[in-house]
């Protein structure tokens, strides 16, 4: 003879009356009946990583603070190797002058060597043209 037990779990929302009701590693999105669900559920590793992230960071921080200088110099050396290997200088679009940005827009609208899809052209123009408030600003900067 088997017995079935019907349990009702509390609904997950962004506010909780106590920590007891909050599931461990609860995501930051709201999960209530009728709301839009996330595109994919988290797998078992992601849930475990979410739960243990805070405590593991504290442990690693304590190890780092109490470690000898030689230990920290080793990781400093690894960081320098990676920095030399990477060789990437971050240059955001906001750092461009208006004239340079206009040239980038013009080149993206009329590419010579390769064919760009129309959707990609529109995306580039929207991204770069948002910085010009009027057409006079574009031509006055040239």
From Swiss-Prot:
<keyword id="KW-0804">Transcription</keyword>
<keyword id="KW-0805">Transcription regulation</keyword>
<keyword id="KW-0539">Nucleus</keyword>
<dbReference type="GO" id="GO:0005634">
    <property type="term" value="C:nucleus"/>
</dbReference>
<protein>
    <recommendedName>
        <fullName>Putative mating-type transcription factor</fullName>
    </recommendedName>
</protein>
């Amino acid at each position: 003879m088997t017995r079935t037990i019907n349990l009702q779990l509390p609904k997950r929302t962004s506010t909780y009356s106590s920590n007891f009701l909050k599931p461990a590693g609860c995501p930051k999105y709201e999960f209530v009946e009728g709301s839009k669900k996330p595109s994919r559920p988290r797998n078992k590793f992601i849930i475990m990583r979410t739960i243990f992230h805070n405590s593991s960071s504290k442990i690693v921080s304590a190890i780092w603070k109490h470690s000898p200088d030689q230990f920290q110099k080793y990781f400093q050396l690894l960081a320098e190797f990676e920095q030399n290997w990477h060789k990437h200088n971050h240059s955001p679009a906001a750092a461009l002058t208006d004239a340079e940005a206009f040239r980038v827009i013009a080149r993206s609208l009329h590419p010579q060597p390769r064919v760009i899809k129309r959707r990609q052209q529109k995306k580039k123009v929207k991204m770069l043209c948002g910085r010009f408030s009027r057409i006079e600003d574009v031509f006055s900067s040239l």
